[in-house]
Amino acid sequence: MSQNDSSPDIRSPRAALDSSLVNTAATTASKPPRKTFRQWWRASFGQTRTAVLINLVVMGVTLWLVWKSLSWAVLFATAPWQDPAACQQSAGACWPFLLEKAPLILFGTFPYDDRWRPLVVSACLLLMSAATLFQWVTWKWQVAGWVTSLMLFSLLMGGGAWDLSIVPNAQWNGLPVLLFLGTVSLAAALPVGLMLALCRNSNLNLLHWPATVFIEVLRGIPMVAVLFFGVFVLPLLVGAFKLSAIYAALIVLVFFHGAYVAEDLRSGLQSIPRGQWEAASAMGLRKTQVLRLVILPQAIQSATPALTNTAIGGFKDTSLIVLVGLHDLVSTAKMSFAEAQWQRYALEAYVFVGVIFFVLNGLIAMAGKRLESRLHHH
């Protein structure tokens, strides 16, 4: 046998077993020691007496609120299938009231026999919002879907076509108005905000200063003032065109939200190192290609949490349209308990509206988190 041949490792069975046990012990993670009650208590409630006292008080208040809410909503509540008269003897929620008044809360004063029209419109807007937020379809299908949804909104809500009765704008209330103003204004605010952010970041004074003034003015005045301008002043400025209150409110909301979106995107643009511009330009990319392929994806990823917060705040602020004569869910909820026999059930109406807002804003938050994760992986 040659010298280069390796000789076999000859060990006794006892030595081989000991070696195996050593290797197994080295690779097996030891279990952490069990915490004593004192250690668990300090980790859960704090190290000092003050921290423990505060935590116990907060826990007690939380448990009390949970119990009171459960008692009101379930234990002492009147079931939805019971007669509304049974609510008089109940100490909890009156769900028959909500079952009876839900159509009024959702669709307001829209004619009763035609309430299928705002129902179809709301379903289309919700479907397109979900398809856009969660990217279920390509952008071409999104554009086609939004155009179709907006056409349906105008035709079904207003009527006059397909032998539909004409419904004046004053009777467009509730959920379809909230979805229309909330989703469309925020969707249109994204390109407006992007253009404003790019103009404000520009070195050309002709673009920089007008964009800066526009953004700071809109961010410096309250939303109510902007809505008053849109509903009462803007129609006078475009007197040649008949502009209804809901479309006037939509126009000013687009630019109002666009100003906040612009600042969110500008912060994302400023977080990108200048060296990335120079490196991409050195590879032969044009400025538009650098912006589209290198800078904007990173800027949007960086600004996604701020954009999500702006979207949620803007969607909730849509309720302020009630101050200019338009009626969203909060306003129609007040209509539902306007009669004397229902006035004691205002809480049920507002809980119903709050659940709707919570679900819709939760979807926006989920979509923002998913977009941020998707951009991070790409």
Q: Regions from the language model: what does each represent?
A:
Residues 3, 9-378:
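Transmembrane alpha-helices and adjacent helix-loop boundaries
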